């Protein structure tokens, strides 16, 4: 299995919303613009190196585990009540058969759509999520919402600020395990961590075997067909151009894993906006546009010079659920990657 040509170093967008950019905290991790409809990672952390021995062998009671940010967290073993504050975490939690443990999930403020701004309609239905489970994570974090859910453990990504994490742990006394993979292999690591927390290592190993097999299949496909068609992958558009993924993002890494080359893959801006003239000059063989949350082909057709892009003219514009491009979770590998392999290497 080959490593992706670009190992993501910046967190993929993590929170779907259409909010003014003035609310966003770290500009390098957001889509710069007045308002966009994608997921956004709000916060970055200086991850401390784990010191000494942290991880213990759990069997009951509390145990220590090192999370993705290098934090040594003392967590309850197999907690019955868990708050999951990220769609990318809810995905493996569900796949591992842990839905019954989930008592709360992340939501945006009611005025901006609540649950439906963080989760797609398919996710809400599949995972049986309800508005009553909402913990508001934006534009401000509601400690009260979380307290009312009475979880024993919080699993969160970097849509949660360090201040909020500190408040959860010090004010409420609830441990927080941060799951924010930095690479594709980190997705498998998080599956293993979740398996350890809930005492279901066998199920985690089985899921990781599926993920490994899919990555191996992608590697074999690239060997059998070494062509690397150029691609514009976009998740939103406005009058100025097409929002896309630069270097160090999961969106770019997924394109590379599928045996193609993003026309913006070397851009130092993780989430640049490409003007129409740049897209036309690059002449990508394919266009992959993110769908869901109100985005569809008709929406992108309103973009500058959309109908003049040769890939669009030749019928090589393909819609793909935005979750597959932005959420670092098993579904990105199990569903998104095979779809792209079929598109680029039929």
Label the predicted regions:
Residues 2, 6, 11-92, 201-234, ...:
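Bacterial Sec-exported substrate-binding components of ABC uptake systems
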Residues 243-271:
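Alpha-helical, coiled-coil/dimerization segments enriched in small aliphatic residues
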